[in-house]
A protein has these predicted regions:
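The feature captures the conserved acid-bearing segment of alpha/beta-hydrolase catalytic domains
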Residues: 178-252
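Short, flexible/disordered intra-domain loops and linkers
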Residues: 86, 115, 119, 224-238, ...
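C-terminal catalytic histidine-bearing segment of alpha/beta-hydrolase fold enzymes
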Residues: 246-299
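Serine-hydrolase catalytic machinery in alpha/beta-hydrolase-like enzymes
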Residues: 44-46, 51-54, 59, 66-145, ...
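Primarily recognizes the serine-hydrolase "nucleophile elbow" in alpha/beta-hydrolase
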Residues: 132-207
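N-terminal cap/lid segment of alpha/beta-hydrolase-fold proteins
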Residues: 2-66
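Alpha/beta-hydrolase-fold catalytic nucleophile elbow
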Residues: 107, 153, 192-195, 214-215, ...
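Alpha/beta-hydrolase
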Residues: 68, 74, 194, 261-264
């Protein structure tokens, strides 16, 4: 009996190999830029702690392809917590590698003085780190990554970074950015925005990158529409969640598929005990289908 034909990048077909703990950059760490809002002592004691930033790279074994799509996954944690080994990030990366992707889960710099300046600086530092991770992955290697098929996704803070990569790379960086020279021969084809936000809807005018978005309509941390992250005006101006982002993207002619969810919590893919939820699998399969459709249209 003939086996059914495999649907490219939708049906698992490969064993997965992992290269763990790959150092992709060396950066000054916690509060490396200092903070005008914090005590002088904290700036002296805590700034410029050197960090080796690491990623875990997942790849299909025995695929034989000379050209693989890349998925860059970024964890959440309010720019304070989290790491590349979070169960959801690992599960997503393993699944996408089994489909034929190279998938990388990255660590990035964390921590900020609790102020608007502090959070903005933490976001900028983390975005610079994500840039560095992309530069590393797209550099000379045996990973066989196709620079025309790059995808970025993340949860919460990681989704903010994914949106920043897709849209800020094509526009102007905020001041003091240290964006690497990535060149012009690559493209982010689509973003998985899992309960993230943008600070300014005008950033969506910088590019034309499709967005797949999931978020609870009653998210207690990131506003579904417009509001204050963590419901704390002291650390941020108002931001725009997935509904506002998708509405503006659609008005600009950008494909945006929004999946509002009824759960009364922020993190949808894992429960309080750290176990994957049924929603994780829904997101995983929706993301695979969304990305595959973009590849069929050549991004």
């Amino acid at each position: 009996m003939t086996e059914p034909a495999r649907i490219p990048y939708l049906t698992p077909a490969f064993e997965v190999g992992v290269e763990a703990g790959v150092v992709y950059a060396e950066k000054d760490g916690y509060w490396s830029q200092g903070s005008s809002a914090g005590p002088q002592l904290s700036q002296v004691a805590l700034m410029r702690h050197p960090l080796s930033l690491k990623m875990d790279i997942y790849f299909p074994e025995g695929d034989g392809s000379e050209s693989r799509p890349l998925l860059l996954m970024m964890h959440g944690g309010s720019f304070l917590f989290g790491n590349r080994e979070e169960a959801g990030q690992v599960a997503w990366c393993r699944h996408f590698a089994s489909l034929g992707y190279v998938a990388a889960s990255i660590d990035y710099r964390l921590g900020f003085w609790p102020s608007r300046h502090g959070l903005l600086q933490a976001e900028q530092d983390a975005l610079d780190d994500a840039d560095s991770a992309l530069a590393y992955l797209l550099g000379p290697s045996d990973l066989r990554i196709d620079p025309a098929r790059v995808f970025a996704a993340g949860t919460s803070a990681g989704a903010i970074l994914a949106l920043g990569l897709a849209y800020s790379l094509y526009g102007e960086r905020p001041p003091k950015g240290s964006r690497p020279r990535l060149g012009t021969d690559f493209r982010i084809c689509a973003v998985g925005d899992l309960w993230g936000y943008v600070r300014d809807l005008s950033v969506l005018e910088n590019a034309h990158v499709p967005i797949l978005a999931f978020q609870s309509e009653q998210d207690p941390v990131v506003p579904f529409d417009r509001g204050y992250p963590m419901q704390a005006r002291v650390v941020s101006d108002a931001v725009y969640g997935t509904r506002a982002t998708c509405e503006r993207a659609t008005a600009l002619g950008i494909r945006c598929a929004l999946h509002p969810c009824p759960e009364k919590r922020h993190r949808l893919h894992m429960d309080k005990e750290g176990r994957l939820t049924p929603r994780y699998y829904e997101i995983r399969d929706a993301m695979a289908a969304f990305f595959a459709e973009e590849m069929r249209s050549l991004c």
